[in-house]
Each structure stands twice: as structure tokens, then as C-alpha cells.
Amino acid sequence: RQRTEKIGFLFSFPVTTISEYIARLITGVVIAAEQESYNLVLYPLKDDPLEQLTRICRAREVDGLLLLARAQIDPAISLLEKESVPFVLVGRRFEQPHISFITPDFVDGARQVTRHLLALGHRRIAYTTRPALGITSRDRLEGYRQTLAEAGIPFDPQLVVETTTQPNSSYQAMNRLLDLPNPPTAVFAIHDLVALECLQAAADRHCRVPDDVAIVGFDDWSMSLTTQPPLTTVRTPLYEMGRQATHTLLNHVTEPDLPAVQTILPVELVVRQSTAGSSPV
């Protein structure tokens, strides 16, 4: 089979909400691809991703694919395996040992957040989950639950609230938490954008952050430096993830029989004023 000297990057997010995430990742991908004289083709996933994927595979448009997809990925994986197209999952892990992936350590990120809040004296720590994100959301929930259990704090399902990508979903979730008879003193948001709405909800209720409620995000988007107050968050190595994913993919392209490479990259808690020095009353 003749090589195209191109790799594809498939992503299934609305481009508007995820632009910074994609941009950082793609920078790493492009630089690694250029080192190997490869070009990059971007494929925003359409309404019928399997049909789109089938066309890409059959037309042999690219030599391999990077898949940035969060949930419902199994049919795509089956198709790529059937078509013998090399691929690497980016930004999530996968349970099967023969699938290559690279992901931030979501479990440890959640553990670092929860440990930080516990060290400040918080005991009622809420978590805003997003079931549509699949395993990446469950991994964070797992890290949060593990760390509470290690501290001897019983898990309270009332403190886990679901959010969606709908506008104001996270704002409403924060209000539900603050309306509880015994509200949380700290909130761990699944993403910085979610944390932004939580900050707004707190401000609208004249709740002081971090004095009345501490708030933590995830991903360390640039806006987290300029929120009021600046946001404690978890920095994920997006550039490095893109770079390593590309090298792994190109190794699979040149040597199809190589075993799968499963990489979990460390993440870093970045402490700012949204938690700094806060302690529950």
C-alpha cells in the first residue's frame, strides 16, 4: 500500500467550545509530524462519524489517524481495525491492551485536587461530573472518591451533580449545590469552563470565593489566570500529548506489527486564589 505522507486528526467537539484544547494539542502534533516530513489533515467529526470514517479509510486519504473522541468510540475502533488503519486514541484511556492511547492522568489529577482541598480543611467537597465525556469523567470521579475514602470521609452522592454542554448547565448545577441544606465548602469542576460558571453562580449569590466556597477547575486554560479570583486548576500536558501521540502513530505506520503503546502522562495542580488559604467555617 502506497504511503500518502499524511496523518489525520479526528475530533468530535464543537470547535467553538474546545478551541484552546485543540490548538495546544495540534501544535504538538504538527511539530512532531513535520519532523517526520508528514502533513496533517483535520477532520471535525460529522453527524454520522462512521460513514465519514469509512470514506476516509476506503479512500486511503491518510496513513494513520489520531482520534480525539471522548465517548462512544467502540464502533469507530472496530471499523479502523477492520480496515487495518493505524490509529492512536488521544485524551482518554481504553481498557483493551491492544489499543494504543495517550491520556493525561485524570485519576491522579482528581486525587491532587481532592488532597489539596482536604489539606485546607474542607470535608464537604462537591464534584461536577459530565457523563457524556465517558471514561474521562468517570476517572476523575474515581480519583475523587478514592481520596475521600483514604481520608475516612463517606461518599455523599448529593455532592456529585451532572452538567452538560448546554449554556448555564454548570451555573444551575452550582446553584443546586449551594441550595443544599448542608452545602459544600469546596467544588471541584470537571473543566475550567464549568468552573467559570460556578464562579459566576457564586458571585451572583454574593458567595465569596474562596472564603465561602473554594472552586477548582481542570485543564488550565489561559482564562483561568484572569477569572475573579484566578482559578486553581490542573494543568494537562496537551502539547506533549500531541507530540507523543504523533510519534506513536508514525511508529505504527512504519511498523504495523509493533505492540500497542499505552501512555498516561502526569498532570500538575496549579494553586491560585480560588482556593488559596480557604478554610471552611
PLM feature spans:
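Alpha-helical recognition/docking segments in bacterial nutrient-uptake
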Residues: 5-115, 119, 179
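N-terminal helix-turn-helix DNA-binding module of bacterial transcription factors
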Residues: 1-5, 279-281
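Periplasmic-binding protein-like
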Residues: 62-68, 126-128, 160, 181-191, ...
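Hinge/beta->alpha junction and helix N-cap segments in small-molecule ligand-binding domains
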Residues: 12-24, 42-51, 102-112, 128-173, ...
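Short loop/turn motifs at secondary-structure junctions
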Residues: 3, 61, 121, 156, ...
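Flexible loop/turn connectors
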Residues: 171-281
